[in-house]
Amino acid sequence: MISEIIEKWIKGILIDGITGNLSGLFDNVNAKVGEIASDVGSTPQAWNSGIFNMLRNLSETVVLPIAAAILALVMCHELIQMITEKNNMHDFDTSMFSRWIFKSAFAILIVSNTWNIVMGVFDATQSVVNQSSGVIIGETSIHFDRLIPGLEFQLESMTIGSLLSLWFQTLVVGLTMNILSICIFLVTYGRMIEIYVVTALGPIPLATMGSSEWRSTGQNYLKSLLALGFQAFLIMIVVGIYAVLIRNISGAADIAGAIWGCMGYTVLLCFCLFKTGSISKSVFGAH
């Protein structure tokens, strides 16, 4: 009689501990996954206007003069190349100066409007992301009371040893999920910081667009912008796949299997989020 009371008391403590661990197990991950859609669906200006204005000021006051000097050197080199390639001026054609003036004017126009060009790229990619968000993103929150109906009833039918093992597993998984929530934070915030850094240096690579020899630098920069912009679209696809996989766990009979399954899908989510950058760059040929 006393042993049954003690056993019931111990089981009650373990069940309360397990349900308490499960109730807050995925809270941080749910919050971070929920923030992904809003973070990747924001333009650089909307995400943090303070950082945006600071970097725009730096770009226009510090980077742009450097880009202007590079542009002058590039166009002088281009003029020399155009002259020398005509058999050291033996086949001199005055129309080459018209072409050089046109190329110089076009290059100056690009450099002076770098910020508008860069923001235009991100506005275009973000419109794609926002249009697709309603189709791709589903319910991504993990709630064990919904995934496993009758959770407490299942726990009461388990032995003390099984409950103790499950309680320890929830502690380990809880620690892992906190680490995974930090990984999700690193991907989303790291991408935005990379966008700001790349944007601030924009005038320098675009200053090479007027040169037939060095324009690959500017072309690769534009590819990098497109890769960063469409990385958001890939992130949305990954989160959408994650939402579908999580829903497949619904109705699982094995509580421990459901816990580790959810954690496995979340680990897979983090891995795929880290891969979106390299996949996007490979698609656009950026390096």
Where are these predicted regions, by residue range?
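Alpha-helical transmembrane segments of multi-pass membrane proteins
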Residues: 224-236
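Gly/Ser-rich, low-complexity
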Residues: 1-70, 83-95, 105-176, 215-220, ...
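Elongated alpha-helical scaffolds
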Residues: 100-103
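Membrane-embedded alpha-helices of multi-pass transport/permease systems
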Residues: 73, 118, 122-125, 183-186, ...
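Short alpha-helical basic/polar micro-motif
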Residues: 77, 187, 191, 228
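Hydrophobic alpha-helical transmembrane segments of integral membrane proteins
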Residues: 164-215, 233, 237-243
